[in-house]
């Protein structure tokens, strides 16, 4: 399983706030993985409770070399629809037609209003 660890996400954020995150993506497979091309996308997941998962494609395009680790920076602006809730936040590689879940440890984050 590809592991995606990240830093830069505080425990409490506000809607409208721009987050600057650093992702460390580990590819354990003997082949490169192309992200943002074909059907594989990097998405940020915000999970609240058992049934709500908001998924936001990052739009990033890159290749993770075989059996290696890649570090990338990125930004995300917290959307108003997330305000007033606490989420488990993480990243996943999504392939069209497949269910996805966190590719790494999620981080609890509370989203407040502006």
Regions found by a protein language model. Give the residues of each.
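A short beta-turn/strand-edge loop motif at beta-sheet boundaries
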Residues: 13, 30-37
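Beta-sandwich strand segments
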Residues: 33-35, 97-108
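Short proline/glycine- and polar residue-rich coil/turn motifs
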Residues: 60-70
